[in-house]
């Protein structure tokens, strides 16, 4: 079976985007992995699927598969590429669309300058809903934030659990470029306190409106940018009293602008969405 695809990226976080409305998509976990392979497939951090909605109050359904073949709840950078894709393909003439994801609905708006703003909804901070199981962990309060101590590589990592529709553990560090992200990231991702694994974010505060961020993504490893990770990091930074909205987040792949007014207000993310190329791939050519 041959599939039409579009290769896109949002601040360097790269995706294979597939139209699941006009072509049948029934891939195995192994096929998703092969499609994401940078040696044997197209290569991507995640695969994004456009589907018909399952409810009447939204325009599309948005599904995400990680490079390891697992389906996940959300991807913020992918959401920006999603609305660019459906607009460029003539699947909608709206500048703003409502999209269902695994755990809710998000609103995506294409701006006149080509940037995309995503209404990510309110952050979820209740540990059980992240989900996070902190029983027995040391606790430290800073501002409105409650951080929990994980023993990682012989050090205590003080993490703030935040869900942006997917789970994040945010750690504030002094020098993110020289921090051992590749060593600590997998240990946090697979820590027993996160039953569904977790995206590990490493946040450096530059000033009250500027931050640097690296994210070790669940099922993908470190990526050049992570939209939900940037949102979670800003939420944690604001709650700790270290940041004020709006915040420009510098990632290795580019800048994301994050705004949050606190409490139950939605987090708003603005950033780029770029089409790289289009193509056709024969699933029979992928390794089994």
UniProtKB/Swiss-Prot annotation:
GO cellular component: cytosol
Cellular compartment(s): Cytoplasm
Range of residues in the leader sequence: none
Functional pathway: Amino-acid biosynthesis; L-lysine biosynthesis via DAP pathway; DL-2,6-diaminopimelate from LL-2,6-diaminopimelate: step 1/1
UniProt-annotated binding residues for substrate: 13, 46, 66, 76-77, 166, 199, 217-218, 227-228
EC number(s) recorded for this UniProt protein: 5.1.1.7
One Pfam match: DAP_epimerase
Site label Could be important to modulate the pK values of the two catalytic cysteine residues, positions: 168, 217
Keywords tagged on the record: Amino-acid biosynthesis, Cytoplasm, Isomerase, Lysine biosynthesis
EC category name: isomerase
GO biological process, one term: lysine biosynthetic process via diaminopimelate
Top-level taxon: Bacteria
InterPro entries hit by this protein: DAP_epimerase_AS, DAP_epimerase_DapF
HAMAP family: DAP_epimerase
Family label: Belongs to the diaminopimelate epimerase family.
Job of this protein: Catalyzes the stereoinversion of LL-2,6-diaminopimelate (L,L-DAP) to meso-diaminopimelate (meso-DAP), a precursor of L-lysine and an essential component of the bacterial peptidoglycan.
Complexes and interactors: Homodimer.
Protein's UniProt name: Diaminopimelate epimerase
Species this protein is from: Cupriavidus pinatubonensis (strain JMP 134 / LMG 1197) (Cupriavidus necator (strain JMP 134))
Lineage: Bacteria, Pseudomonadati, Pseudomonadota, Betaproteobacteria, Burkholderiales
Gene that this sequence comes from: dapF
């Amino acid at each position: 079976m041959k599939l039409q695809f579009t290769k896109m990226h949002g601040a360097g976080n790269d995706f294979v985007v597939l139209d699941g409305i006009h072509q049948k998509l029934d891939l195995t976990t192994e096929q998703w992995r092969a499609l994401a392979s940078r040696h044997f497939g197209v290569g991507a951090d995640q695969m994004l699927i456009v589907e018909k909605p399952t409810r009447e109050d939204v325009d599309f359904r948005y599904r995400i598969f990680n490079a390891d073949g697992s389906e996940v709840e959300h991807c913020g950078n992918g959401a920006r590429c999603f609305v660019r894709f459906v607009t460029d393909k003539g699947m909608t003439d709206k500048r703003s669309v409502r999209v269902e994801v695994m755990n809710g609905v998000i609103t995506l708006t294409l701006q006149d300058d080509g940037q995309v703003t995503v209404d990510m909804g309110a952050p979820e901070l209740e540990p059980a809903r992240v989900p996070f199981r902190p029983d027995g962990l040391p606790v430290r309060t800073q501002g409105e934030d409650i951080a929990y101590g994980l023993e990682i590589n012989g050090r205590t990592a003080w993490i703030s659990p935040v869900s942006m529709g997917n789970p994040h553990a945010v750690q504030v560090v002094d020098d993110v470029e020289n921090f051992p992200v590749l060593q600590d990231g997998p240990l946090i991702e697979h820590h027993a306190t996160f039953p569904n694994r977790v995206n590990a974010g490493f946040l450096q505060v530059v000033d009250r409106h500027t931050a640097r961020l690296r994210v070790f993504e669940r099922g993908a490893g470190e990526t050049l940018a992570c939209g939900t990770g940037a949102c979670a990091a800003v939420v944690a930074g604001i709650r700790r009293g270290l940041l004020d909205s709006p915040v420009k987040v510098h990632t290795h792949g580019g800048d994301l602008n994050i705004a949050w007014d606190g409490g139950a207000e939605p987090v708003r993310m603005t950033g780029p969405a770029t089409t790289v190329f289009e193509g056709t791939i024969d699933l029979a050519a992928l390794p089994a």
